[in-house]
């Protein structure tokens, strides 16, 4: 081989890298190419999807992602605020976009499929599309009512199929959208579309993951941020599941605060009369039923003590402690359902804390003697309302006492008949 001759790799063709092949487009040229292609594809969304798929190899989607999504949604490039840049020149706009589509769920779902295919093909567009949707939600005031509706439907469908994360909804908490009622109106349409794709549990789960479950009231102005107003607004719109969800969330928040305050008062050994008064006021203020409070009281009472680690001593310690707080529990176990909840809580506690396993029957008898639990509640728990935890152990413990209750009941009935 000639020493000056450079080796050649035969059979190898050197290709220009794809990113170097892309044509150098300005945004306006990018727009014109996109508008022309969409107009040629027309209402055939399969043709639109194919055009977008193939054109991505020569158009710089990465650089002009905002222009791409502006045109697919609004038919035109959008200026800051949401106005159309080319509003006066119809040649630079297309009617084959989401805003010009028919206002029905199936049509918008077909458009959603175009976005799904595009983002699956060009994964790098995922974040750009998320940013675009956040931006479009900020621009809602610039869009007509029907355009807002279509955007809400598109957003709901894309949230339902997982193309978009629920975090896009943070744009709706913007003051101007909230004050003018646009945020709440848009949210209702969006949630309807979302729940047409997924069930309520899926929707609420997504809201929790995005930490939006506690912010739903912020869709309304400050003077209307009440659970009652939200519940009426969303129930009237056919979204009772979301109303119920918010009530539960608010109730959970209230219960946590109540439990924290109760724990504090018990640790300070506040008089029982004061604790009763406080709990009743909180129940009234937050519309909490007795059934929601009795379990909290039990938890707080049991957390207020450093328990002995010796099984033979803990029962005596527990009975002494619970005898002190029996009058408190008696006030909030005036209903049969509350009594059953308390019994189940005691059962679960004794099972979860092994040193209390043998103390269950003694605690129940104490509560019976202190008028916290009625014989009807104890018998119902024994026959059908017990939970699975430690079931055989606790039923066996209670057998003799239950037999005594049944015999006492029979004697009482026979005496009544004799009279």
Curated annotation (Swiss-Prot):
GO CC terms: cytoplasm; membrane
SMART domains in alphabetical order: eIF5C
Main location as per UniProt: cytoplasm
Residues that bear Phosphoserine: 412, 414
N6-acetyllysine found at: 117
Compartment annotation: Cytoplasm
Similarity-based family: Belongs to the BZW family.
Protein name: eIF5-mimic protein 1
Protein's organism: Macaca fascicularis (Crab-eating macaque)
């Amino acid at each position: 081989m000639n020493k000056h001759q450079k080796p050649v790799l035969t059979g190898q063709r050197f290709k220009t890298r794809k990113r170097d092949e892309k044509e150098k487009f300005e945004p306006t040229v990018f727009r014109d190419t996109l508008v022309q292609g969409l107009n040629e594809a027309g209402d055939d969304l399969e043709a639109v999807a194919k055009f977008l798929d193939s054109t991505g190899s020569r158009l710089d989607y990465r650089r002009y992602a905002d222009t791409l999504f502006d045109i697919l949604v609004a038919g035109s490039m959008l200026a800051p605020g949401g106005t159309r840049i080319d509003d006066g020149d119809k040649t630079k706009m297309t009617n084959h976009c989401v805003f010009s589509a028919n206002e029905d769920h199936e049509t918008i779902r077909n458009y959603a499929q175009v976005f799904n295919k595009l983002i699956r093909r060009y994964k790098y567009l995922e974040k750009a599309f998320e940013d675009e949707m956040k931006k479009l939600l900020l621009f809602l005031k610039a869009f007509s009512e029907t355009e807002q509706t279509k955007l809400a439907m598109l957003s709901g469908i894309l949230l339902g199929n997982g193309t978009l994360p629920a975090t896009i909804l943070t744009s709706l908490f913007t003051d101007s959208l909230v004050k003018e009622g646009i945020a709440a109106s848009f949210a209702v349409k969006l949630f309807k579309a979302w729940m047409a794709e997924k069930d309520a549990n899926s929707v609420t789960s997504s809201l929790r993951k995005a930490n939006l479950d506690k912010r739903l009231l912020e869709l309304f102005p400050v003077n209307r941020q009440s659970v009652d107003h939200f519940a009426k607004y969303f129930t009237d719109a056919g979204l009772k599941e979301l109303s119920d969800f918010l009530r539960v969330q608010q109730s959970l928040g209230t219960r946590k605060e109540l439990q924290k305050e109760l724990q504090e008062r018990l640790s300070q050994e506040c008089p029982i009369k004061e604790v009763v008064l406080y709990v009743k006021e909180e129940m009234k203020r937050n519309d909490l039923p007795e059934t929601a409070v009795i379990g909290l009281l039990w938890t707080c009472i049991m957390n207020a003590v450093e328990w002995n680690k010796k099984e033979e001593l803990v029962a005596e310690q527990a009975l002494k402690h619970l005898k002190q707080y029996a009058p408190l529990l008696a006030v909030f176990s005036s209903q049969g359902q509350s009594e059953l909840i308390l019994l189940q809580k005691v059962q679960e506690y004794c099972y979860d804390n092994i040193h209390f396993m043998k103390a269950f029957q003694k605690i129940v008898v104490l509560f019976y003697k202190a008028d916290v639990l009625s014989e009807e509640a104890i018998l119902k728990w024994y026959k059908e309302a017990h939970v699975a935890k430690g079931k055989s152990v606790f039923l066996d413990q209670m057998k003799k006492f239950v037999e005594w209750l049944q015999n006492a009941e029979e004697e009482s009935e026979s005496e009544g008949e004799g009279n």
